[in-house]
Amino acid sequence: METFLGILIPFLGTTFGAACVFFMKKSLGDLVQCALAGFAAGVMAAASVWSLLIPAIEQSEGMGKLSFLPASIGFWVGVLFLLMLDRLISHLHVGSNQAEGPKSKLGSTTMMVLAVTLHNIPEGMAVGVMYAGFLAGNAQITAASALALSLGIAIQNFPEGAIISMPLQAEGESKGKAFFGGVLSGVVEPIGAVLTLLAAQLVIPALPYFLSFAAGAMLYVVVEELIPEMSQGKHSNIGTIFFAVGFSVMMTLDVALG
């Protein structure tokens, strides 16, 4: 039950965020969008470092001066994996009119949801890897540290859900469809976590690689998607401040609970 709830928490964050469409005005202001994107970026960056990369290096201490190697390899594989998906799947970032990936006849709404869904894959994997390590009895991964990561991702998923559903409504979609689009973007997270847990026999022996893989993929999303979003327009300073807030929140969660 503890693992089930831990896997579900990030998805609930997306769902609650998407529900903002029912009680907020039709569109988010530029300042709010910059703040939300900055906060999400800060949480993801801190989670990548404190919850994933540092544990990956610590678990490789037996390699001595080469303890950085598994983390470096996994990190790069994660970055390249997301880069490959970006090239293979048509998608549209929030606030952009230029689609990325191969040419497609998909509507802008569908491609926008695809973009967030695509970038939620590593978050689901990160949660799955943490709980796989905890269930396997890894001394460096506790129930509290796994929960800290789940809570951190849920916190950053809340604004992410709103960033999807609110613009969809502003583009003419009904509140129900806009909410569904926001929720749909987060479905991949529990699916990714469950699939990772099912592959635990493969994951556990190579845990440092999988932890750093998730970190690399998440930081790719931060740099490629969220930082440009938080830096748009005249409110970039707000985005930077909320990046620091998000980073501090996630760092505190990880240290306090981990």
For the regions a language model picked out, list residue spans one by one:
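Intrinsically disordered, metal-sensing/regulatory segments
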Residues: M1-G258
